[in-house]
């Protein structure tokens, strides 16, 4: 591909009010360095956990770090798709997105190192076939497909897989698990800070994915069917992953966690995304570019979680 023009030189410059550039500016303003997080007390708290509690927490962290690494490796075709569309603002944001995924991989590995976990951790994923299906097959396949087919429909399928299922259901449920483990027991302060920082980053990621689906649905209503179909394909797989994780621990899950609570939480986060995308049907595409409802949805989820956890800790 040869370059014929530069978007930043066009008349009027860049539209700083567009959602992608709002997200980009937000990421710059909230920059954080993993090296600033103190994991000293986490090691002491870790030693006080039971064997099953350490096993559960290690498995949870393993799922997170492998997922962060997977997206670090797989997101590049989405950048190329944005370039093919001439969407500089989205491409700028996705460079930040990729950097943040790499940083998340770094900080989870730093936490594992800090609590003394150095063995090979692949076995923690071997017992979770749904995880392997999502992260080792569905995610790379739909993102890599953008290299050959950057069409709106392919973008919607890729965004559903990552932004709505992996981040919008599974990662949010994982943060919920960490909060139930850490906040309610006042342990692992480094992990608490880590999750707070990563959660803030990934709210922007999810908002961008919702925005991308909304603009394609607004432009062509056929993409609503693409969105709906892909969500309905993957939601059962995401819920099966939660069930597989709990099945490993029998009738007494570590930390007194509840499978039904987690399934309800994850389902709620998945189902509420349908309405946000549906609301874009028939809308002028230009309106979607400066509609901040995707970011507001993620902030709503975060506020709900804060209130729930505050009530549980009271």
Swiss-Prot record:
Binding annotation for Fe cation: 101, 167, 202, 205
InterPro entries associated with the record: Ferritin-like_SF (IPR009078), R2LOX (IPR033908), RNR-like (IPR012348), RNR_small_fam (IPR000358)
One of the GO BP terms on file: deoxyribonucleotide biosynthetic process
Residue numbers binding Mn(2+): 68, 101, 104
Keyword set, alphabetical order: Iron, Lipoprotein, Manganese, Metal-binding, Oxidoreductase
Keyword Ubl conjugation: no
Cross-link 3-(O4'-tyrosyl)-valine (Val-Tyr): residue positions: 71-162
EC number assigned by the record: 1.-.-.-
Protein name: R2-like ligand binding oxidase
Cofactor binding, per record: Binds 1 Fe cation per subunit.
Transmembrane segments: none
UniProt GO molecular function: metal ion binding; oxidoreductase activity
Subunit structure: Homodimer.
EC primary class: oxidoreductase
Organism of derivation: Mycobacterium tuberculosis (strain CDC 1551 / Oshkosh)
Role played: Probable oxidase that might be involved in lipid metabolism.
Cofactor(s) required for function per UniProt: Fe cation; Mn(2+)
Record flagged with keyword Hydrolase: no
Family: Belongs to the ribonucleoside diphosphate reductase small chain family. R2-like ligand binding oxidase subfamily.
């Amino acid at each position: 591909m040869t370059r014929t023009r530069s978007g930043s030189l066009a008349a009027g410059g860049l539209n700083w009010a567009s959602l992608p550039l709002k997200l980009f500016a937000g990421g710059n303003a909230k920059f954080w360095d993993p090296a600033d997080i103190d994991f000293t007390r986490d090691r002491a708290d870790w030693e006080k956990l039971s064997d099953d509690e350490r096993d559960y927490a290690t498995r949870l962290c393993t799922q997170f770090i492998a997922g962060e690494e997977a997206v670090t490796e797989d997101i590049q075709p989405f950048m190329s798709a944005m370039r093919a569309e001439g969407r500089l603002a989205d491409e700028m944001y996705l460079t930040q997105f990729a950097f943040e995924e790499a940083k998340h991989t770094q900080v989870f590995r730093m936490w594992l190192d800090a609590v003394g976990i150095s063995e090979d951790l692949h076995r923690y994923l071997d017992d979770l076939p749904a995880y392997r299906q999502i992260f080792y097959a569905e995610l790379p396949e739909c993102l890599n497909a953008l290299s050959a087919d950057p069409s709106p429909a392919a973008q919607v399928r890729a965004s559903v897989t990552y932004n709505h299922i992996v981040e919008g259901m599974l990662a949010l449920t994982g943060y919920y698990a960490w909060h139930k483990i850490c906040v309610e027991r006042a342990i692992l302060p480094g992990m608490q800070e880590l999750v707070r920082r990563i959660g803030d980053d990934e709210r922007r990621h999810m908002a961008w994915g919702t925005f991308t689906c909304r603009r394609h649905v607004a432009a062509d209503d056929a993409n609503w069917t693409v969105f709906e179909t892909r969500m309905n394909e993957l939601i059962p797989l995401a819920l099966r992953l939660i069930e597989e994780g709990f099945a490993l621990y029998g009738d007494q899950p570590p930390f007194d966690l509840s499978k039904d609570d987690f399934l309800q939480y994850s389902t709620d986060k998945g189902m509420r995304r349908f309405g946000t995308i549906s609301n874009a049907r028939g809308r002028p595409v230009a309106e979607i570019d400066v509609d901040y409802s995707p970011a507001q949805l993620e902030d709503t989820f975060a506020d709900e979680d804060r209130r729930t956890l505050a009530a549980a800790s009271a």
